[in-house]
Amino acid sequence: MKKLLLWLTALLAAVGLGILAPGPASAATSYCGLQWGSLAKAQGPLSTAPVTSVRTGQHYCFDRMVVDLNGPVKGYTVRYVPEVIQDGSGFTIPVQGRARLQVTVNAPSYDQNGNVTYNPAAKAELSNVAGYQTFRQVVYAGSFEGYTSIGLGVRARLPFRVLTLDGPGSGSRLIVDVAHFW
Protein backbone atom coordinates (compact mmCIF):
# COMPACT_ATOMS: atom_id res chain seq x y z
CA MET A 1 0.00 0.00 0.00
CA LYS A 2 2.89 2.33 0.83
CA LYS A 3 4.42 1.67 -2.61
CA LEU A 4 1.14 2.56 -4.32
CA LEU A 5 0.88 5.82 -2.39
CA LEU A 6 4.51 6.59 -3.19
CA TRP A 7 3.90 6.04 -6.92
CA LEU A 8 0.74 8.15 -6.91
CA THR A 9 2.56 10.96 -5.07
CA ALA A 10 5.43 10.83 -7.58
CA LEU A 11 2.99 10.86 -10.50
CA LEU A 12 1.06 13.84 -9.12
CA ALA A 13 4.31 15.71 -8.46
CA ALA A 14 5.49 15.03 -12.02
CA VAL A 15 2.22 16.34 -13.47
CA GLY A 16 2.30 19.34 -11.13
CA LEU A 17 5.86 20.20 -12.16
CA GLY A 18 4.99 19.85 -15.84
CA ILE A 19 7.28 16.88 -16.39
CA LEU A 20 4.32 14.80 -17.53
CA ALA A 21 1.91 16.97 -19.45
CA PRO A 22 -0.68 16.17 -22.05
CA GLY A 23 0.30 16.98 -25.64
CA PRO A 24 -0.98 20.12 -27.29
CA ALA A 25 -4.54 20.07 -28.54
CA SER A 26 -4.57 19.59 -32.29
CA ALA A 27 -6.73 21.73 -34.52
CA ALA A 28 -9.63 19.92 -36.10
CA THR A 29 -8.73 18.80 -39.60
CA SER A 30 -11.00 17.60 -42.33
CA TYR A 31 -10.83 14.21 -43.98
CA CYS A 32 -7.48 13.82 -45.78
CA GLY A 33 -6.85 17.53 -45.20
CA LEU A 34 -9.41 18.44 -47.88
CA GLN A 35 -10.82 21.94 -47.53
CA TRP A 36 -13.72 21.58 -49.97
CA GLY A 37 -17.38 22.41 -49.51
CA SER A 38 -20.67 21.23 -50.96
CA LEU A 39 -22.03 24.51 -52.33
CA ALA A 40 -22.50 25.11 -56.07
CA LYS A 41 -19.46 25.97 -58.15
CA ALA A 42 -19.75 27.82 -61.46
CA GLN A 43 -17.47 29.62 -63.86
CA GLY A 44 -17.28 31.17 -67.28
CA PRO A 45 -19.01 31.50 -70.62
CA LEU A 46 -19.98 29.05 -73.37
CA SER A 47 -17.34 27.22 -75.37
CA THR A 48 -17.48 25.81 -78.88
CA ALA A 49 -14.99 23.08 -77.90
CA PRO A 50 -17.11 19.91 -77.88
CA VAL A 51 -17.27 17.22 -75.21
CA THR A 52 -15.59 14.00 -76.43
CA SER A 53 -15.69 11.58 -73.47
CA VAL A 54 -16.48 11.03 -69.79
CA ARG A 55 -14.45 8.77 -67.51
CA THR A 56 -14.04 8.09 -63.81
CA GLY A 57 -11.34 7.01 -61.39
CA GLN A 58 -10.77 6.22 -57.73
CA HIS A 59 -8.27 7.95 -55.46
CA TYR A 60 -7.38 7.45 -51.80
CA CYS A 61 -9.47 10.40 -50.54
CA PHE A 62 -12.01 10.94 -53.33
CA ASP A 63 -13.67 9.61 -56.48
CA ARG A 64 -13.05 11.53 -59.72
CA MET A 65 -15.05 12.19 -62.87
CA VAL A 66 -13.31 13.67 -65.92
CA VAL A 67 -15.06 15.27 -68.89
CA ASP A 68 -12.74 15.54 -71.91
CA LEU A 69 -13.18 18.38 -74.40
CA ASN A 70 -11.63 18.95 -77.82
CA GLY A 71 -10.48 22.47 -76.95
CA PRO A 72 -10.44 24.74 -73.90
CA VAL A 73 -12.97 24.42 -71.06
CA LYS A 74 -14.54 27.84 -70.64
CA GLY A 75 -17.37 27.31 -68.21
CA TYR A 76 -19.36 24.93 -66.06
CA THR A 77 -21.89 24.66 -63.23
CA VAL A 78 -21.70 21.84 -60.67
CA ARG A 79 -24.27 21.68 -57.89
CA TYR A 80 -26.28 19.34 -55.72
CA VAL A 81 -29.86 19.00 -56.96
CA PRO A 82 -32.93 17.11 -55.73
CA GLU A 83 -33.33 15.61 -59.25
CA VAL A 84 -31.16 15.50 -62.37
CA ILE A 85 -33.01 17.16 -65.24
CA GLN A 86 -32.54 16.29 -68.92
CA ASP A 87 -31.48 19.18 -71.12
CA GLY A 88 -34.16 20.44 -73.50
CA SER A 89 -37.04 18.23 -72.31
CA GLY A 90 -37.05 18.95 -68.59
CA PHE A 91 -37.60 15.25 -67.88
CA THR A 92 -36.22 13.84 -64.64
CA ILE A 93 -33.38 11.34 -65.11
CA PRO A 94 -33.30 8.59 -62.45
CA VAL A 95 -29.93 8.52 -60.70
CA GLN A 96 -28.83 6.09 -57.99
CA GLY A 97 -27.43 7.46 -54.74
CA ARG A 98 -28.65 9.44 -51.76
CA ALA A 99 -27.45 12.72 -53.32
CA ARG A 100 -27.09 13.97 -56.89
CA LEU A 101 -24.71 16.38 -58.57
CA GLN A 102 -25.79 17.97 -61.85
CA VAL A 103 -22.65 18.72 -63.84
CA THR A 104 -23.31 21.14 -66.70
CA VAL A 105 -20.43 21.83 -69.07
CA ASN A 106 -20.83 25.05 -71.02
CA ALA A 107 -19.94 23.17 -74.20
CA PRO A 108 -21.89 21.05 -76.70
CA SER A 109 -21.57 17.33 -77.47
CA TYR A 110 -21.46 18.14 -81.18
CA ASP A 111 -19.07 20.08 -83.40
CA GLN A 112 -19.71 23.34 -85.28
CA ASN A 113 -21.21 21.37 -88.19
CA GLY A 114 -23.68 19.58 -85.90
CA ASN A 115 -21.81 16.26 -85.98
CA VAL A 116 -22.08 14.37 -82.69
CA THR A 117 -18.79 14.24 -80.75
CA TYR A 118 -20.09 12.41 -77.70
CA ASN A 119 -23.02 10.00 -77.87
CA PRO A 120 -22.61 7.29 -75.24
CA ALA A 121 -24.17 3.91 -76.00
CA ALA A 122 -25.24 3.45 -72.37
CA LYS A 123 -26.61 6.83 -71.31
CA ALA A 124 -27.62 5.45 -67.90
CA GLU A 125 -24.09 4.22 -67.16
CA LEU A 126 -21.35 6.38 -68.65
CA SER A 127 -18.79 4.62 -66.48
CA ASN A 128 -18.96 1.51 -64.35
CA VAL A 129 -18.60 2.82 -60.80
CA ALA A 130 -19.36 -0.45 -59.00
CA GLY A 131 -17.07 -0.66 -55.98
CA TYR A 132 -16.39 3.08 -55.80
CA GLN A 133 -16.51 4.51 -52.30
CA THR A 134 -18.54 7.63 -53.18
CA PHE A 135 -19.92 7.39 -56.75
CA ARG A 136 -23.09 5.37 -57.32
CA GLN A 137 -23.96 6.19 -60.95
CA VAL A 138 -22.90 8.47 -63.82
CA VAL A 139 -25.64 9.29 -66.36
CA TYR A 140 -25.85 11.36 -69.53
CA ALA A 141 -28.53 14.04 -69.20
CA GLY A 142 -28.13 15.37 -72.74
CA SER A 143 -26.71 18.21 -74.76
CA PHE A 144 -28.92 21.13 -75.72
CA GLU A 145 -28.19 24.60 -77.07
CA GLY A 146 -24.47 24.39 -76.34
CA TYR A 147 -24.69 22.88 -72.84
CA THR A 148 -23.94 19.26 -71.93
CA SER A 149 -25.25 17.81 -68.67
CA ILE A 150 -24.19 14.78 -66.67
CA GLY A 151 -25.83 13.41 -63.54
CA LEU A 152 -23.54 12.09 -60.85
CA GLY A 153 -25.17 9.97 -58.15
CA VAL A 154 -23.19 9.88 -54.91
CA ARG A 155 -23.46 8.09 -51.56
CA ALA A 156 -24.31 11.28 -49.63
CA ARG A 157 -23.99 15.05 -49.93
CA LEU A 158 -20.22 15.26 -49.61
CA PRO A 159 -17.66 17.99 -50.28
CA PHE A 160 -16.46 18.36 -53.85
CA ARG A 161 -14.13 20.46 -55.97
CA VAL A 162 -14.03 21.34 -59.65
CA LEU A 163 -10.82 21.75 -61.65
CA THR A 164 -10.02 22.56 -65.25
CA LEU A 165 -6.79 21.31 -66.80
CA ASP A 166 -5.23 21.80 -70.22
CA GLY A 167 -4.28 18.83 -72.37
CA PRO A 168 -3.74 16.34 -73.61
CA GLY A 169 -2.78 18.10 -76.84
CA SER A 170 -5.10 20.98 -77.68
CA GLY A 171 -7.89 19.50 -75.54
CA SER A 172 -8.80 20.14 -71.93
CA ARG A 173 -10.54 18.46 -69.01
CA LEU A 174 -13.22 19.37 -66.52
CA ILE A 175 -12.60 17.40 -63.33
CA VAL A 176 -15.08 16.83 -60.50
CA ASP A 177 -13.64 15.25 -57.33
CA VAL A 178 -16.05 14.14 -54.60
CA ALA A 179 -14.56 13.32 -51.18
CA HIS A 180 -15.23 9.99 -49.51
CA PHE A 181 -16.07 11.67 -46.17
CA TRP A 182 -16.36 15.12 -44.59
Residues covered by each model-derived region:
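Generic structural signal for short, solvent-exposed loop/turn connectors between secondary structure elements
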Residues: M1, V15, G90-T92
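Bacterial N-terminal signal peptides that target proteins for export
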Residues: M1-T9
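C-terminal region of N-terminal signal peptides and the immediate post-cleavage residues
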Residues: L6-W7, G16-C32
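Short linear recognition/processing motifs and adjacent strand/loop elements at protein termini
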Residues: A27-W182
